[in-house]
């Protein structure tokens, strides 16, 4: 299991980093007391979670008397984000947020927070100065450090419209215009994973429609990757989610795997009715 502690100065990008880590599959928890980290990791392991992260900010340090002891015992990867004081000041002025230490003098609060977090900074495996970084630049820095340079993932999810489209879908492709194996008694019990079903679905007349779907999915995924996203979900739907959508999702995966890391999920392939 990978265990990561994300910390650093308020306004340096922890919210952006937290979201990106979640996109990479980390289960993230904010300001959990260190004495609860071992039970968290035990529960995560029992549930099959491979990546866990805890966000720590200066407000919580007063309640973290056992932090050093737990860090020494668990030895998590520590990522620390910082920025120059004038940059943090500008960011706070733009967002009109109140500093978490909230004493009323922003520059003094930034200095106090930096002193309070000095111990964690000294333990950091990665220190990122975000003063000149865009959100995308921060994500790229984290991806390089975590070995996720190829971290963009294209998810293809087949489904049946009768069961509703996946809520997480960024793009929905409708493959109901393609030939339907449901009406062939010999093919009806099979799924889109079957070669005979695939041949039926991808008849010569169906090829132009499929090529258009392939182009749309590829362009959408390229755009998402260019924006710095960690993953993009394309849902492929037919009526029941057993034949056409499965066949198309599989073929899309085959043809797009040379451009992206691809994951295929057949949500409704085992459903009847």
Curated annotation (Swiss-Prot):
Molecular function GO labels: ATP binding; GTP binding
Residues that, per the record, bind GTP: 57-60
Domain of life: Bacteria
Entry binding sites for ATP: 8-15
Record Gene3D superfamilies: P-loop containing nucleotide triphosphate hydrolases
Signal peptide: none
UniProt KW keywords: ATP-binding, GTP-binding, Nucleotide-binding
InterPro entries named in the record: P-loop_NTPase, RapZ-like, RapZ-like_N, RapZ_C
Family (UniProt): Belongs to the RapZ-like family.
Primary role: Displays ATPase and GTPase activities.
HAMAP family: RapZ_like
Annotated protein name in UniProt: Nucleotide-binding protein TT_C1664
Organism, as annotated: Thermus thermophilus (strain ATCC BAA-163 / DSM 7039 / HB27)
